[in-house]
Amino acid sequence: MMKLVLFSVIVILFSLIGSIHGADVPGNYPLDRSGKKYPCTITWKKNPSCIQICKKHGVKYGYCFDFQCWCEIFGRLKTFKI
């Protein structure tokens, strides 16, 4: 009985650790024609210019991260220059 309780506590702790970190959403920085990342000045989740840039690259959502536009679910295979 004690082993079952201990096992249950361990499983609960590991599941809590996983939920704290959450799942990382894959993404990438889109590149312009010269191969550079698109700059942005306002780092917040709903940056209209970054969303527009990401839509041009075929991605539904993007935001400003570290003063550069970041597109979610944008892998290396989809990286192209417009």
From Swiss-Prot:
This is Beta-insect toxin AaBTxL1. Shifts the voltage of activation of para/tipE voltage-dependent sodium channels (Nav) toward more negative potentials. InterPro entries: LCN-type_CS_alpha_beta_dom, Scorpion_toxin-like_sf, Scorpion_toxinL/defensin. PROSITE patterns: LCN_CSAB. Residues 25-82 form the LCN-type CS-alpha/beta domain. It comes from Androctonus australis (Sahara scorpion). It holds the Pfam family Toxin_3. GO terms for molecular function: ion channel inhibitor activity; sodium channel inhibitor activity; toxin activity. Residues 1-22 form the signal peptide. Negative results: is totally devoid of toxicity when intracerebroventricularly injected into mice and does not compete with radiolabeled voltage-gated potassium and sodium channel toxins in binding experiments on rat brain synaptosomes. Expressed by the venom gland. Belongs to the long (3 C-C) scorpion toxin superfamily. Sodium channel inhibitor family. Beta subfamily. CDD domains: neurotoxins_LC_scorpion.
